[in-house]
């Protein structure tokens, strides 16, 4: 697939219809607010009904916003979301598959329990697959230009993070799938394009580190484990400050969301800031692979 083949005309976000999973908090909420600010109609999908209803109420002054409680790991729930979107708007132009969780396992790779894998991959990977298989055929049938944005992470999407092995593995899968999705859109001559989003800019005030609040009872850990307990954002900042000896940078989620939408409008495949350090790490990883050595990981202070 050549670069020319991947190129697609810019998208007009005003008047578009966007769906954002995991949209009631953190990065997802920031994306919803930014989309409304650019004149898009937004359908927020989230598993937390109370947070979803509050977010819809808070953002309603910005434009056409609605919410559908959705469990992204469930095909019926996701199909209900799609039906609600087409019933209300008649189409979906922008699909942000953003819902994500940590494994809750922590510790060493062999200390992760099967349910840690099922929980993390169920949301981060299977949830993306269900979203794509549910929405993309309908979007393709409509024949309209559109974008499918998958939220990955530099923690795994770029390079492994040894102390977060399951989460990083799930995000590596998301990045790999995003590339495959884009190649197939182009080869099929589709009007759709894919993007992979790498959030950046510092620590992020999201619900990721307290995601265990939504963990189903049937996927609970069997043993006590060595995993990190759920923590608030302030507790996360304190943990990183103690590990590094300095106050951590905090990402501006609103500004990040605006930059993401700039990239979506341009039909960029990779949505990220500050790729210089990433490129350097990838070069070192490629060199190590060429020598048959263990590639360097992505080092984070957690």
Enumerate the language-model features and the residues they cover.
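Canonical Rossmann dinucleotide-binding motif of NAD(H)/NADP(H)-dependent dehydrogenases/reductases
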Residues: 10-42
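Active-site loop of short-chain dehydrogenase/reductase
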Residues: 16, 64, 91-92, 139-153, ...
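A short, exposed helix-loop element centered on a Lys and neighboring polar residues
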Residues: 132-133, 179
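SDR active-site lid
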Residues: 187-271
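Catalytic loop of short-chain dehydrogenase/reductase
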Residues: 149-173, 178-179, 183-187, 200-203, ...
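The beta1-alpha1 cofactor-binding region of Rossmann-like NAD(H)/NADP(H)-dependent oxidoreductases
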Residues: 49-50, 69-80, 114
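Substrate-binding pocket helix/loop in short-chain dehydrogenase/reductase
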Residues: 106-109, 113-118
């Amino acid at each position: 697939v050549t670069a020319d083949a991947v190129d697609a005309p810019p998208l007009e976000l005003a008047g578009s219809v966007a769906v954002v999973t995991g949209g009631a908090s953190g990065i997802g909420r920031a994306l919803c607010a930014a989309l409304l600010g650019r004149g898009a109609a937004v359908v927020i999908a989230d598993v937390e009904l109370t947070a979803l209803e509050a977010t819809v109420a808070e953002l309603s002054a910005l434009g056409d916003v609605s919410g559908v409680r959705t469990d992204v790991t469930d095909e019926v729930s996701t199909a209900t979301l799609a039906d609600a979107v087409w019933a209300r708007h008649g189409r979906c132009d922008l699909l942000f598959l953003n819902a994500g969780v940590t494994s809750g396992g922590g510790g060493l790779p062999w200390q992760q329990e099967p349910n840690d894998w099922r929980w993390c991959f169920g949301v981060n990977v299977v949830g993306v697959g269900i979203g794509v298989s549910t929405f993309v055929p309908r979007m393709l049938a409509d024949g309209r230009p559109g974008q499918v944005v998958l939220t990955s992470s530099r923690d795994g999407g770029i390079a492994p993070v040894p102390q977060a092995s399951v989460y990083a593995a799930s995000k590596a899968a998301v990045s790999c799938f995003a590339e495959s999705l884009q190649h197939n859109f182009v080869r099929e001559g589709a009007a759709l394009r894919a993007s992979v989003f790498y959030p950046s800019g510092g620590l992020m005030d999201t619900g990721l580190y307290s995601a265990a609040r939504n963990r189903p009872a049937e996927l609970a850990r069997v043993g006590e484990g060595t995993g990190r307990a759920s923590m608030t954002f302030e507790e996360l900042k304190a943990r990183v400050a103690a590990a590094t000896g300095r106050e951590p940078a905090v990402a501006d989620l609103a500004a990040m969301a605006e930059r993401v939408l700039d990239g979506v409008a341009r039909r960029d495949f990779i949505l990220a800031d500050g790729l210089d350090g990433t490129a350097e790490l990838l070069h070192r990883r490629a060199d190590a692979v060429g020598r048959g050595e263990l590639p360097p990981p992505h080092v984070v202070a957690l």
